[in-house]
Amino acid sequence: TAKNAINYIVENNTGASFGVVAMAAESAVVVPPTMDHTLFLQRMNDIPIGNLGDGTAIGVGLSTAIYHLAASSAPKKCIVLITDGENNAGAIHPETAAELAASQNITLYTLGVGSKGSAPIEYIDPKTNKKYSGYLTSSFDSTQLKLIASIANGRYFEAQTLNDLSLALLVITKNESTVQTYHSRTTSVEYYDKLIFISAIRLSSSCWRI
């Protein structure tokens, strides 16, 4: 899953700051950028399904992430948008959000995940143990994802498999992994980049949607 790939990236980038914005028809900050990787992974893995409505508001999700990165003094800041849906909700156009990111020197990487079409899927709510079944519908707009990535000086990746996704995230973290070290006579302080993941994985069925 996307969570497994992100787990690996976080666990192997000690000292970097990571955050997560969840997105559907609305968006919400699950974890603001933090160097506390234990807290980050716990909150990311506990993201509930279906709490943010039906749809994919890419522009709104990006704007939420930008708001939390803009004031940072980190030397490099980036957003990784992971989505299997096209923009179909929200009042902010994705291109407008991408232009805002570029104006704040925030790099945007976009990942279109899955192969287009539908596939059966089952989900067990960890809180209630209730089992849901439905279809995972992938309909990402690669043209738009390429465009907004280019506007914000980033890159688009298409990830049809978990391996593709993992490799894309490795490339991104390698590109963004510069570390600046400042020295004084008695201390050495390492200042790392900040990165926010936006999760916009959309599951649709007659029972629930995200």
Where in this protein do the model-derived segments appear?
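Extended, hydrophilic extramembrane loops/domains of integral membrane proteins
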Residues: 145-176
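Active-site-proximal beta-strand/loop segments in catalytic clefts of secreted hydrolases
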Residues: 21-24, 82-85, 111-114, 159-160
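VWA/integrin I-like adhesion module and closely mimicked acidic/polar interface patches used
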Residues: 53-56, 78, 85-151
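Short beta-strands and strand-coil junctions in structured, solvent-facing domains, enriched
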Residues: 27-29, 88, 117-118, 156
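Short beta->alpha linker loops
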Residues: 35, 57, 140, 160-164
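Short, hinge-like loop/turn segments at secondary-structure boundaries
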Residues: 36-39, 126-129, 174-177
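C-terminal signal-anchor/stop-transfer transmembrane helix together with its immediate cytosolic
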Residues: 178-210
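Membrane-embedded segments
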Residues: 1-77, 91-92
